[in-house]
């Protein structure tokens, strides 16, 4: 979604995404503008058991969710949180982390973070939030910590899509 927004704004983003994004011809492109990577915590290779995402060295990180996955690689949620902590520590102090509110993500950030963090949907007026205008999230309102508001009506449905849109904004 972020790649699509950047493209529509004429920024010609580079990207590496697990599938072919809507409106694009492939799953990767070098581009001329910002570079977007869709990444997860799966290990890099049989000889490098670190999560792939620690090799990317991002300036900006969006963490939408963190849950137990990849039981073939990780023993438990704590093992995954450790990998996310390594990722968070890769972001420079001049960077930016955008993170949704969850106990699992909070635990990672509480382990140590020197990067400014914007929080999503915590219920606090100091954070970014969204409010559904219909039960399917086909219409919703976004609010910024500064009090700015914007309404979105689109053809997608589901809270997860609305949350992705909020993170992209």
Language-model features, listed with the residues they occupy:
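A short hydrophobic beta-strand->loop->alpha-helix junction that borders the nucleotide-binding pocket
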Residues: 17-21
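Hydrophobic/aromatic ligand-binding patch that stacks against planar heteroaromatic rings
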Residues: 5, 52, 87
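Switch II of P-loop NTPase G domains
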Residues: 43-57
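Acidic, Mg2+-coordinating active-site environments of NTP-dependent enzymes
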Residues: 8-11, 23-25, 32, 36-38, ...
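A conserved segment at the C-terminal end of the G1
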Residues: 1-15
């Amino acid at each position: 979604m972020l790649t699509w927004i950047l493209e529509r704004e004429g920024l010609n983003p580079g990207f590496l995404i697990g599938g072919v994004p809507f409106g694009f011809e492939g799953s990767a492109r070098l581009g001329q503008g910002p570079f977007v990577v869709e990444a997860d915590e799966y290990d890099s290779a049989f000889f490098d058991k670190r999560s792939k995402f620690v090799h990317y060295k991002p300036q900006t990180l969006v963490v939408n969710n963190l849950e137990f996955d990849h039981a073939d690689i990780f023993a438990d949620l704590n093992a995954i949180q450790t990998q996310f902590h390594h990722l968070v520590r890769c972001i420079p102090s001049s960077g930016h982390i955008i993170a949704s509110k969850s106990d699992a993500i909070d635990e990672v950030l509480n382990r140590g973070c020197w990067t400014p963090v914007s929080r999503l949907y915590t219920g606090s007026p100091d954070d970014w939030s969204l409010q559904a205008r219909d039960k399917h999230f086909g219409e919703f309102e976004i609010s910024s910590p500064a009090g700015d508001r914007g309404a979105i009506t689109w053809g997608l449905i589901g809270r997860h899509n609305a949350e992705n849109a909020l993170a992209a904004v």
